[in-house]
Structures are given as C-alpha cells and as structure tokens.
A protein has these predicted regions:
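N-terminal low-complexity, Pro/Thr/Ser-rich intrinsically disordered segments
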Residues: 31-54
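Acidic/histidine-rich, surface-exposed loop or edge segments in extracytoplasmic proteins
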Residues: 34-41, 89, 122-125
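Short N-proximal segments of mature Sec-exported proteins
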Residues: 49-112
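N-terminal regions of proteins, emphasizing targeting and processing segments when present
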Residues: 13, 27-30, 113, 117
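Positively charged n-region of N-terminal signal peptides that target proteins for export
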Residues: 1-7
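Signal peptide processing junction and immediate N-terminal pro/mature segment
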Residues: 20-32
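Compact alpha-helical subdomains of small soluble proteins
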Residues: 90-164
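Bacterial N-terminal signal peptides
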Residues: 8-19
C-alpha cells in the first residue's frame, strides 16, 4: 500500500484587540494528508465540481506571467503568481468553498504528471513537477488539459449510464 504523508503543524494565533473583541486566525501548513490504494485508483467517480476545479485552475494560470515555477506549497490568496498546486488549491476553494487535498480533480492532475514523467518518483507530485527545471509553462497547461479531458470524458460516460 502506498502511503504518503505531509508532516505538519496546525498553528492557532489569537490576538486580543480589546476586552470585548477577540480575533483568531488558524493557519494550516503542511497538514498530514495520507493517501491509499483507494485514492490512487484512476477510475474514481467524477463530479461537475471536479471539472469546474480543473477549468478554473487553467483560467488562473492564464499566462506564463502568472505562473510561479518555484512552488513551496504555501499559497496566499493575495499572491499574484500561482504554481500548479496553488492554482488547484485556489480553484478548489472557489468552487467547493474548501480545499480537499485528495479530491478527484487534484488526483487526476497527479496522474497526468505521473504519465507525463513516465512514473518518475516525486515526494510531492504537483510541487515537484512544477519545480523541475525542464518543466515549461506549456507543460503545466498540457497537464491541466489532460486531466480536464479525462474528467470530462468520465463525466460524460457517467451521465450517459444514467440515461434510461
């Protein structure tokens, strides 16, 4: 069984502004996210939201001018440039209202990376592929296209099966 973990820390910071007002910020960084054989299956059911996440990530990475090729997997909503990982995280937050690390959309991008790199081992597929010196912006867009096409095709097949 394949098991990948992101070691992490959950940091909670509280700031008292006045005796009646309290502001709390929670920062999750490198939170442990296990994977399993089930999550690594390439035939997971897909949803319209999966397709929208991939389409939105591609929109976020509209040009090479907004691509951050030095990913750290720390994403800030105020950023002006986005790595592959951060574009997917931002898209997930916009579409779902939350980030789901092992969501089918993100897994499909990981699978596209594996296929494009002929199974090269990465500790963090999205970050490491993004940061490879040989990776070009066009490669990032192609990875998103492959994942989008796969999800779109599976969604169409699922919807076809539902018809009477």
């Amino acid at each position: 069984m394949r098991l990948a973990m992101r070691l992490g820390v959950l940091l909670t910071v509280s700031l008292s502004l006045a005796s009646t007002m309290r502001v709390t910020a929670v920062v999750a960084q490198n939170t442990a996210v296990p994977t399993s054989d089930e999550l690594e299956r390439r035939d997971q059911p897909v949803t319209n939201e999966d397709l929208r996440i991939l389409q939105r990530a591609s929109q976020i990475l509209a040009s090479s001018a907004v691509w951050n090729r030095h990913d750290t997997r720390i994403c800030n909503p105020a950023d002006k440039t986005w790595s592959l990982f951060c574009a997917l995280e931002k898209a997930s937050l916009e579409v779902l209202g939350e980030y789901r690390h092992r969501d089918v959309a993100l897994q499909e991008v990981r699978f596209a990376v594996e296929d494009a790199t002929k199974g090269q081992e990465f500790e963090h597929r999205l970050m490491d592929y993004n940061n490879l010196p040989s990776t070009k912006f066009e490669d990032i867009k192609q990875i998103l296209k492959v994942a989008t096409d796969r999800v779109s095709g599976r969604l169409a097949a699922q919807n076809h099966k539902k018809l009477p």
